[in-house]
């Protein structure tokens, strides 16, 4: 009993610690710049160490609880409670999110030190984290929706932080609009649950849906996850989101916004267990996403955009795990992915800052001599991303591909996922080769220095996580689904073989700059990849242009010509003109015409009287 009390109280204390810096901003006295260091970073750091207590209790005793704090709303047939669900998923995810955010906040202290609104920036980052915590620990759909909308609005504010830049404003609007599409799916699903199941409590939903056809609400949930986690069709906002400051990109892509959609499906996965249509949809959608975005990453030259596309590719892999009916593997990949993706963004931010805001990898090179720590950590995170054995990404990526390999599902999903895994190795090695190796390809700069503890310490902490976190999580989390225990050697080594194939391909491509096989290379495939499959041009340019053209035609032709000219006053005028012309022609003073008309009228009248 006392263990359960300690378990619940420490988790609620963690929320209190995180909200304390927000409450201090209610003071009308403006805080100084040390507020970010004294309050925000310290609060997240303290909350992380506090969250380790329930984590160790869970690992030791397996305790999972649901804490109901108060009743939000009560009607005759419908209750909404504010309750927190502390189970395997939330207890493991919370320390990881806090650890990653702690590193990002410390890095942001150095990265944003010249920003005049630095305190507000840190407050937004903290609110971003809190809303994600609310989403992760929610025990009902109403509370989950609060966290869902919270991460959405905070992402809009943070992506468009530098609102003086047109690209940042456009990226923020894209994020909101695409997420609105997903929000429609979640809202309609919640309405369906309220009408048909009469509850938003997750445990009651799982029980009452046992003999119910859940296809319609699950399609809404899939749409919601596709919007929030940037699946194919709703993906363009995620690469554009890198227009925000680098700490925002690191937090957004690692442990908050983009994994919210996948986490929604993990949390509500008991509803999907026996629905083959939804599972197949998730599998094919994830496979298509991971291949398409990995192919787009191959030809990008902006270092942050390459990393952003890699995030979208990994989200597709998580969706594949959902479609395989293995939600614990998707969750494992969320946890391991957070470490090396945050480190990749922090390393890229350090490099960009050192090179006077240069983001083109073609203008870098030779940084392993000038930034040895950053270069080493970039290499570690890139290898973890490719699934190098015994790094963090290996334990989750390899498990997903093994599960896909041994399942009796379509070969198309397996083929596309393996191709995407190979592409991951190609663009990761491309970053390493063009940024770290060879000679510098940039102009002479002031001496480059990375001897700042606020730069090195966060990156080193995340590097440790990228090395050992995968094994620690893999060994301590019990699977919720039965896993394949034996398989042939060729299936077991398929993932690492396609990764090696990708590395060899990338090494071969680096030599083709001097020994090209074709004088005029095929630019169609390159342009298709570089321009994201022409998707933004079609969706963001062609469709609005067509709508504007049709609107203009309707306004000028349909409204003006039809209503004003054909039906309105000009229409009446047009009807009267022929009659007027006929009368006018008969009244022109022509004697012969008058006599002829008189004669014809007289003859006609006489004939009629005689009859």
Curated annotation (Swiss-Prot):
Belongs to the complex I subunit 5 family. GO terms for cellular component: mitochondrial inner membrane. The keyword NAD applies. The gene is MT-ND5. It comes from Latimeria chalumnae (Coelacanth). Keywords: Electron transport, Membrane, Mitochondrion, Mitochondrion inner membrane, NAD, Respiratory chain, Translocase, Transmembrane, Transmembrane helix, Transport, Ubiquinone. Its EC number is 7.1.1.2. This is NADH-ubiquinone oxidoreductase chain 5. The lineage of its organism: Eukaryota, Metazoa, Chordata, Craniata, Vertebrata. The chain crosses the membrane at residues 3-23, 38-58, 91-111, 121-141, 142-162, 175-195, 205-225, 246-266, 277-297, 306-326, 329-349, 375-395, 417-437, 462-482, 493-513, 591-611. It is found in: Mitochondrion inner membrane. It comes from the Eukaryota. It holds the Pfam family Proton_antipo_M. Core subunit of the mitochondrial membrane respiratory chain NADH dehydrogenase (Complex I) that is believed to belong to the minimal assembly required for catalysis. Complex I functions in the transfer of electrons from NADH to the respiratory chain. The immediate electron acceptor for the enzyme is believed to be ubiquinone.
